[in-house]
């Protein structure tokens, strides 16, 4: 099925599964939820997200199919002593079918579930990771999920190329459908097993409240396949 998704590309990205949601039912992450977590976000946070009714859920492995990188607003970057990069209102770098672009948090979190992973790296290492990530802005989306090349990037490849080789970050690609890649669930698993990330918060796994701390970690673990 993963191979079929590679071939179908953007067509499947647009499709929704029938009967998962009632007609007119919106996303479970509301504007109120986004405002609740906004002040808790930090530059370098990794967003892992899910749409309950996405057709791609049938083709991509695991509960969590998508990833994005939070760059942060100018004020947060100043507080951490990070470069401002550019005066831009968007603060998430995300690879979607229309390419690698800076986007508003509201767009990235227009989803049903999310988990926020916080990399355990120094400020200098974080600066390096964000600088690397932003070099990929404007590239096309990689519907082939080919991690051997950087001309086009899929969502998790953007995160992989931002952090891999910085500090203790050494993520192992896994073989799927004859090629090496890093699905979002594998990114989560390796990040937790190697102690590279903390689970900052989670939403949409067990109810519609934002959970933090150990409960957030336990809920995330409950979604991962053995």
Protein language model regions, located:
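Cysteine-nucleophile amide-bond enzymes
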Residues: 1-226
